[in-house]
Swiss-Prot record:
The modification Phosphoserine is found at residues 637, 639, 642, 644, 662, 681, 744, 803, 861, 872, 887, 889, 973, 976, 1044, 1111, 1116, 1206. It comes from Sus scrofa (Pig). Residues 29-57 have a biased composition (Pro residues). It is found in: Nucleus; Cytoplasm, Cytoplasmic ribonucleoprotein granule. InterPro entries: Matrin/U1-C_Znf_C2H2, Matrin/U1-like-C_Znf_C2H2, Nucleotide-bd_a/b_plait_sf, RBD_domain_sf, RBM20_RRM, RRM_dom. A zinc finger (Matrin-type) spans 1157-1188. This is RNA-binding protein 20. GO terms for biological process: heart formation; mRNA processing; regulation of mRNA splicing, via spliceosome; regulation of RNA splicing; RNA splicing. Residues 1-59, 238-288, 306-381, 626-902, 971-995, 1042-1102, 1197-1223 are annotated as: Disordered. GO terms for cellular component: cytoplasmic ribonucleoprotein granule; nucleus.
């Protein structure tokens, strides 16, 4: 860019002025007065001549190296000629360029294959580059070479160029004596940047050195060259070296017209700033050939990005001398017929700038875009060479190198153009020569306005023969190749189109036109091969407005979309720049088309209208399908969750709603929709149709799907109706599949059955959900409340979730929901719950084991267990889901929430989008995921306990009169106490199963400590701790949930006692303890959740559930004691051995934040929560104290169990007692 700028400066003034500029630019170049002849130019820059001799000296090799670059000599020559106003100069430059081209061709292999020669050339070029920025522009090696040649002799120039711009060198050398002047100017201007600019990223080097380095890089030796020559590198000084020169070739053309180019560049500079002015001024005043050269120079030197384009553009806007320019160019072309194509290339560049240069700018978007947009003419670029370089900077050296296929210095290398990782040079070569890279380069140059890239392409185009070779050599230059073919051929064609579009015959006209008027054509690249349809492409644009036309080029994996308005096209491009568009999982490169302002081409295949109609009809079909699937969900998508899902699916594309939904449908959209739509019937029905068998019969499949869904569900149900969602997802899925909805007369599969159940859910959810949410809201801000709620749900569900978690969502939801539902909502459900509980226990035993196995895969185990429990807990699921509605989707919260507690909260607030994150939402509360896991653990631990304890709790709750949603579960627990033997018997099995679960829990607890915290802490612990430590429990669960580590530990530890309790016969007590927490939770249907959310629920729970907790705790201690006593039998195994062995933080809830973090059990203060909960709660001292505490609670619980209803007051006493003991 700097070179371009220097060139522009040189060119801007007239021949005479240019010398001044040259002098100015290059200290060593005292007023190279744009001599009439190329050589005249050569002499003008005194500094350049010295460098040329060195190049000559070292140029034997360099010349050979530059031989390749000579391929572009025509450009160089032509460009120099344009720089030189006189036709004679142009002819001379052409001749020189041809000679140099031949020489360079001879020497090309030498430099390309000879590192030493490349180095020498680099050195020479660096020296020359300093004096002749043009050469830098020309592409460090070539440019510098060219300047040398120009400065010195055309052969020398050629020789120097041979590094990179053989032709360019020749062009400069022969093209124009003036060339050196501009070259000098450029160097003095430190056009390194400019050089880079022309070459996109190479310019960063010092004015001269960078060019040289770049040149070498192109050759392969120069590091800078690598950046600039990335593409050149690909050509490796082959034809592409020339190709690199292709840009440099342009620059060579520029070099050739160095003086002119510089002049023009300068003009371009100012002119381009005022685009018309420069082109007019320069083009008009300067010989057109010169102007052309200038343009090329601007293009090449100006970064070949927008400079030439801008120059042309400027001229284009006032293409006054487009023909003249063309003519002038033609002399250049005379040297190389392709030179004219370069002119089209220039127009192409113009097009480039016009086409959102930013498109090209991705790598060098800034510079390109800025420049294209700034001046869209090399002039401006040059005028702001530095700036251009900077803007070009966006076009990193690496991007340039990648663009040009320069072999990476380090492997593995990620192609900055294609974002593809290449592990070895062979792969790199293949990649560079591949379609993807070519297309990306094309897109890159197009979108980035990479004149550099385009320049090379243009240069290639210009020196079609050389350029083509260059392009091919550049293999990497697939882009160039494409450009060459599409742009070389197309430039003429495209430009031709442009020409028609523009009055001027110059192909650049098109660009000018494009530039002049913002286009409404969007260029889409990197379409997935063979899997992209017109619909996919059009779908990308539909969200932004009407698509009026399109072109889908499957062979090149490109497409053009014509929007009705430029604003729509710009909005589309801007949007997809921020969020990559995806088709079939492949990222698309979407940029404003620089080639087309509108698509007047015949539409291939179907008409846009037909396709859009197809898309709309397809969307309707998809919507209907979704309606079937998630039909009600769709409307429900008005809910944040649905919105989340919808936007999420819409995110990729407007029409991808359905498609997005469809693909995720089974895993995300389906469950999301299912939970989204209150009408599960369509969703359930669809789900059943889709995978009833797999989900029902195949635990794994179900788990797989359920895993995703579980996460989503967890969040979503939370927002929607966890019960409903649970029902939908679990029940809908597994329960529905396994059991017709118990609640619904028809089978789950039947829509009516589904709806019946859903209706129940709707009815219930309002209750449970309302209660849950009301309580949650009362207790805490919605978000933390929901999180805590989820936690508490998990905690509450831990009992039910012992089996329920094993069941995934089913057992837990079934139990807690059943219990709560039975209690608060349906007495008959209590029976159902009991049956379900029995089923749950059995299923939980199985699921407990399964869950233990898959506990870590909480979603998986959820799915699997869900399946199991769904079969055995069909009613449980239904009841649980109903209860979930009542309890605010406890089960869902539990099983889903744990996975993504944060998500759930976010989902509640934000919508279903969070559902996606459901699993990832561990950050908000580590407890969240742990909750899920521990919930599973808890379910394993508490299946019996939950059932028996729930029965006990139900009794206790009945005594206590705490009958809420949790009451269903509590009542079940109450029943348990009545059947302590059976409960114990049942529990022992369950407990055995669950004890392993606990072990697994313990094992998982380290990872799931927080989970255990929320689950066990909220559930088991809360039950136990609530029994023993109602206030502590409330606070602890809050704190625990807030700080998951310790509560997790304690909860994890307590689950063991629960299990033990359940086993021993304290199951009723445990159940009572659980039931009480459930009661409390039940009191506030969400209280269970709230307790899980102890943090949130603490206020309310502490208030309403707190008292209850204390009474519960009164009982809970007994239960806990029973549990502890049993744990005392088993405790050594579970709490002590298991936890010690597993080093799981237990009793985390006992760590409460005070001055520091204080462990109430051990009376120890810690400054860090992590230290207290993670380290201390894993310590033997804490384990022992916790065991003692639990044993005490168990003893007290036994006593209290007898008077389970009254102990609540005692609970407070017990907790304080415990606290005292702790203290």
């Amino acid at each position: 860019m700097v070179l371009a700028a220097a060139m522009s400066q040189d060119a801007e003034p007239s021949g005479p002025e240019q010398p001044d500029r040259d002098a100015r630019s290059v200290p060593g170049a005292p007023a190279p007065p744009a001599p009439p002849g190329p050589r005249g130019m050569q002499p003008p820059p005194p500094p350049p001549p010295p460098p040329p001799p060195p190049p000559q000296a070292g140029l034997p090799q360099i010349i050979q190296n530059a031989a390749k670059l000579l391929d572009k000599t025509p450009f160089s020559v032509s460009n120099p000629n344009p720089l030189l106003p006189s036709p004679a100069s142009l002819q001379l430059a052409q001749l020189q360029a041809q000679l140099t081209l031949h020489r360079l061709k001879l020497a090309q292999t030498a430099v390309t294959n000879n590192t030493a020669a490349a180095t020498v050339l680099n050195q020479v070029l660096s020296k020359v580059a300093m004096s002749q920025p043009l050469f830098n522009q020309l592409r460090h090696p070539s440019m510098i070479s060219a300047p040398h040649g120009h400065t010195g002799v055309p052969p020398h120039a050629t020789t120097v160029p041979s590094t990179r711009f053989p032709s360019n060198a020749i062009t400069f050398s022969a093209g124009q004596t003036r060339g050196p002047g501009p070259s000098v100017n450029l160097p003095s201007q430190p056009p390194n940047t400019m050089v880079m600019h022309p070459f996109s990223g190479v310019m960063p080097q010092t004015p001269a050195q960078p060019a040289v380095i770049l040149g070498i890089g192109k050759t392969g030796p120069a590091p800078a060259a690598a950046g600039f020559y990335e593409y050149g590198k690909a050509t490796s000084g082959q034809a592409y070296g020339s190709e690199t020169d292709s840009q440099p070739s342009f620059l060579p053309a520029s070099a050739s017209t160095s003086g002119s180019v510089t002049y023009e560049g300068h003009y371009s500079h100012s002119g381009q700033d005022s685009q018309a002015a420069f082109p007019k001024d320069f083009y008009g005043p300067t010989s057109q050939g010169s102007q052309v050269a200038g343009t090329f120079a601007a293009d090449t030197a100006g970064g070949l990005k927008g400079e030439v384009g801008p120059l042309l553009q400027g001229p284009n806007s006032q293409w006054e001398s487009p023909h003249g320019f063309s003519g002038q160019s033609k002399p250049d072309l005379t040297a190389a017929p392709n030179l004219w194509p370069p002119h089209p290339s220039q127009p192409y560049e113009l097009y480039d700038p016009e086409e959102p240069t930013p498109d090209r700018t991705p790598p060098s978007l800034g510079g390109r875009l800025n420049h294209s947009k700034q001046g869209f003419s090399g002039a401006r670029r040059r005028a702001k060479e530095e700036q251009a370089v900077l803007s070009m900077r966006p076009l990193q050296v690496q991007e340039l190198n990648d663009f040009h296929g320069v072999a990476p210095l380090h492997l593995p290398h990620i192609c900055s153009i294609c974002d593809k990782k290449v592990f070895d040079l062979k792969d790199w070569e293949l990649h560079v020569k591949g379609k993807l890279h070519a297309q990306k380069c094309l897109l890159f140059s197009e979108n980035t306005g990479v004149r550099c890239v385009l320049g090379p392409a243009e240069g290639t185009l210009c020196a079609s023969p050389n350029s083509t070779a260059v392009y091919n050599p550049a293999g990497n230059e697939d882009y160039a190749s494409n450009l060459g073919t599409s742009y070389a051929a197309l430039p003429a064609r495209t430009f031709t189109q442009s020409n028609p579009a523009f009055p001027s015959a110059s192909p650049g006209m098109n660009f000018v036109q494009r530039k002049l008027g913002a286009g409404r054509v969007v260029h889409i690249c990197n379409l997935p091969e063979g899997s992209c349809t017109e619909n996919d492409v059009i779908n990308l644009g539909l969200p932004f407005g009407k698509v009026t036309n399109y072109i889908l080029m499957k062979s090149t994996n490109q497409a053009f979309l014509e929007m009705a308005y430029t604003e729509a096209a710009q909005a589309m491009v801007q949007y997809y720049q921020e969020k990559s568009a995806m088709i079939n999982g492949e990222k698309l490169l979407i940029r404003m088309s620089k080639r087309y302002k509108e698509l007047q081409l015949k539409k291939p295949g179907k008409t846009v209208a037909a396709i859009i109609q197809d898309i709309h009809s397809q969307r309707e079909r998809d919507m209907f399908r979704e309606a079937d699937r998630y039909g009600p969900e769709r409307p429900r998508s008005r809910s944040p969750v649905s919105r989340s899902l919808s936007p999420r699916s819409h995110t990729p594309s407007f029409t991808s709603c359905s498609s997005s939904h469809s693909p995720p449908g089974p895993s995300r959209a389906d469950w999301g929709n299912g939970r989204d739509s209150w009408e599960h019937s369509p969703y359930a029905r669809r789900e059943e149709e889709r995978g009833p068998a797999p989900w029902r019969e195949n635990g794994e499949d179900k788990r797989d799907r359920t895993d995703m869904w579980a996460h989503d569900r967890k969040h979503y149900p939370r927002q929607v109706d966890k019960t409903e969602l649970d029902e939908r997802l679990e029940g809908g899925r597994g329960y529905r599949e396994k059991h017709p909805r118990s609640g619904s007369p028809s089978s789950l599969h039947s829509v009516s059955g589904y709806k019946s159940r859903e209706d129940g859910y709707y009815r219930k959810e309002p209750k449970g959900k309302s209660d849950k949410y009301l309580k949650q809201q009362q207790e805490a801000p919605g978000r933390s409340r929901r999180k805590d709620e989820a936690r508490l749900r998990d905690g509450r569900h831990p009992y039910p979730d012992d089996s329920g978690k094993e069941d995934g969502l089913e057992a837990k939801g079934t139990k807690s929901k059943q219990s709560e539902k039975n209690r608060t909502k349906r007495p008959d459900r209590d029976q159902e719950g009991a049956d379900d509980r029995k089923e749950s226990r059995m299923a939980e035993s199985e699921a407990g084991k399964e869950e233990q196995d898959s506990m870590e895969e909480s979603p998986s185990s959820v799915g699997r267990q869900e399946k199991e429990t769904e079969s055995s807990d069909a009613e449980n699921t239904r009841t649980r889901k109903e209860q979930d509605s009542e309890s605010g989707s406890e089960a869902e919260g539990e099983s889903w929430y744990p996975t993504n507690m944060e998500e759930l909260v976010t989902v509640d607030e934000v919508g279903e989008e969070e559902d996606f994150i459901m699993e990832p939402d561990i950050p908000e509360l580590e407890e969240i995921v742990p909750i899920d896991q521990k919930d599973k653990i808890c379910p394993e631990i508490c299946p019996c306990v939950t059932t028996t304890l729930e029965l006990d709790l139900a009794q206790d709750f009945t005594k206590e009169g705490v009958k809420t949603i949790g009451n269903g579960a509590t009542e079940i627990s109450l029943k348990s106490p009545k059947e302590p033997p059976s409960a114990s018997t049942s529990c022992p099995s369950d407990m055995d199963v669950e004890m392993p679960g606990l072990n697994l829990d313990a094992e998982r607890k380290p990872a799931e400590c927080e989970t255990g915290l929320s689950l066990e802490g909220s559930g088991c612990y809360e039950q136990q701790a609530k029994g023993a430590e109602s206030s502590d429990v409330c606070l602890a669960p809050m704190l625990e949930q807030m700080s998951s580590p310790k509560p997790a530990e304690e909860r994890a530890w307590q689950p063991g006692p629960f299990l033990d309790d359940g086993k021993v016969g304290g199951t009723p007590e445990d159940g009572a303890a659980e039931g009480r927490p459930l009661e409390e939770k039940a009191s506030t249907p969400t209280e269970t959740d709230l307790q899980s959310q102890a943090c949130q629920g603490v206020s309310t729970q502490e208030n309403s559930g707190y008292v209850e907790m204390k009474s519960l705790d009164a009982r809970s201690p007994e239960y806990t004691e029973v549990e502890l006593k049993q744990p005392l039998s088993l405790p050594s195994w579970e709490p002590e051995d298991v936890f010690s062995e597993l080093s799981i933080p237990l009793g985390v809830e006992f760590v409460v934040p005070r001055t520091g973090f204080y462990c109430k059990l051990c009376g120890l203060f810690y400054t860090s929560e992590e230290m207290a909960k993670m380290s201390h709660c894993r310590s033997a001292v804490h384990y022992r104290n916790l065991q003692k505490y639990l044993s005490q609670l168990a003893e007290e619980g036994l006593k209290e169990t007898e008077g389970a209803g009254s102990p609540r007051p005692e609970d407070s006493g017990i907790v304080p007692h415990f606290e005292r003991k702790k203290l």
